[in-house]
Amino acid sequence: MSLTKSSESVFTEEEEEDSFSGRYTLWIKEALEELPHNFTITDPFISGHPIVFASLGFLKMTGYSREEVIGRNGKVFQGPKTNRRSIMEIREAIREERSVQVSLLNYRKSGSPFWMLFHMCPVFGKDDGKVTNFVAVQVPISGREHHRKKLRNVGDLSSDTSPTFGSCRREVCFGNFVCQDRALPVECDDDEQGLEDWEQCEASESEKLKATEAINNVLSILVHYSELSGRLVCGKRYCLRGVDCLSSSLVISLGRIKQSFVLTNPCLPDMPIIYASDAFLTLTGYKRQEVLGQNCRFLSGVDTDSSVLYEMKECILKGQSCTVQILNYSNRKDKSSFWNLLHISPVRNASGKTAYFVGVQVEASCRNTEIKELRPETRQLSVVGAVRVAVRSSLMVTC
């Protein structure tokens, strides 16, 4: 299995790792690397929900280098025999922002499959209750004890005396099954007799306890180093009154939209930005933590037309859409300004109340460029539609 970076990725590996260490301190990675566990940490606020940290134990277990893992989604370790039901359990847990523990068949870089106990939990920001990361611990399932038990129970099902990895489903009985660094030959009879009694590999109680202890150790490190940075995290959600909480499922859905846009909450004081797309960060030169919580006027400068700002304010107060051309300022090295073709539109909830405003930006220089697919105005309306669908279909977390 060879991993390659997607050409659509906005973030470099360094930027993806910075998005993680920015909440803590520069020493967080060194502290995490001292832990003996196999685990990864992902960031749902980055498009594609990529891995932003991988432990040395995880890299050794899978055979990949850190450069091959950082920036990738965890699904790249799955394969043709990975149980789809287990994957749906994990996705559902992410959507509901809760912990989950399942047995999972993953694949090493060499292509060999292995069973593991997958234990994932969310990490919440203590100030706003939003999910900041997901921690996933992977404990290899040995299966020895279960193997012996199964052999005794199903010994009369087949005359074949070759060793069978009884704790695993037939769907993975091919080639060599690697267990605890030892290759065990696995042979399966084509006869289906008795196979319905075979179960998916189940972790022992000690392996489940090991996963729980590992999660607690990782969380302890994250909490400690977040205290040093002043941006506290915790393993439980603490929502402050008046602070908007976007579910991670909504954040992931919004991350699939590749255009430049921001989402603001008109119900909060000063209508702050609560989501900024990767393309917006590229256009303006700002980092995500510099944008969230700001009012959109932070992009304005000395030469920004105040009458345009007033027009935008009036439309927002009336709950109406508007399209303007406004001079904005970037955070690039040259602090350059750019003409922004900005479309603002309300996003309503199921009851018809305005829940958010979406602002879609197109650099005006692109307006005169021949675009084969869609005109800028059409692209903006497409983004608005995609945001509305994401908001209405995602599970919203209410504080």
Curated annotation (Swiss-Prot):
Originating gene: TLP1
TM ranges: none
Keywords per UniProt: Chromophore, Flavoprotein, FMN, Photoreceptor protein, Receptor, Repeat, Sensory transduction
Record flagged with keyword Flavoprotein: yes
Post-translational modification summary for this protein: FMN binds covalently to cysteine after exposure to blue light and is reversed in the dark.
Protein name: Protein TWIN LOV 1
Family annotation (PROSITE patterns): PAC (PS50113), PAS (PS50112)
InterPro entries attached to this UniProt entry: PAC, PAS, PAS-assoc_C, PAS-like_dom_sf
PAS domain residues: 26-97, 249-320
Residue numbers of S-4a-FMN cysteine PTMs: 296
Species for this entry: Arabidopsis thaliana (Mouse-ear cress)
Any Gene Ontology biological process: response to blue light
Subunit structure of this chain's protein: Interacts with VTC2, VTC5 and BLH10.
Domain PAC: 98-153, 320-376
Single annotated GO MF: photoreceptor activity
